[in-house]
Amino acid sequence: MKIINIGSERALEVIKAPQISEKATFLAEKVRQIIFYVSRDANKAEIKSAIEQIWKSQNIKVKSVQIINVKGKKKRFGRYIGQKSDWKKAFVSLKDDREIDFTDVRLFEDK
């Protein structure tokens, strides 16, 4: 995976939110993988760079990133059928058995 530098604004666009579910909690405890909702146009290198930049104060390093494109479900509204938007999620493995503190986000360092 190539190393790229992205700005802090793009980092916040790439990483939308962590996924909180039973499966995500199980993976975080057993396999040390964290699941994030990410932007649909993001690639693995951007996701890795964004996570390392957002949680730079915790010295987080990413070991690997796997991406899944999820199709939106069809929903029915009375007699009309609509479809939810497609989305993308990333499974991120961290180096050195670190854990991310989601409340500690520092993008701009004080000088």
UniProtKB/Swiss-Prot annotation:
One of its GO terms (biological process) is translation. The keyword Ribonucleoprotein applies. It comes from the Bacteria. GO terms for molecular function: rRNA binding; structural constituent of ribosome. Signal peptide: none annotated. One of its GO terms (cellular component) is ribonucleoprotein complex. Keywords: Ribonucleoprotein, Ribosomal protein, RNA-binding, rRNA-binding. Belongs to the universal ribosomal protein uL23 family. One of the early assembly proteins it binds 23S rRNA. One of the proteins that surrounds the polypeptide exit tunnel on the outside of the ribosome. Forms the main docking site for trigger factor binding to the ribosome. Part of the 50S ribosomal subunit. Contacts protein L29, and trigger factor when it is bound to the ribosome. This is Large ribosomal subunit protein uL23.
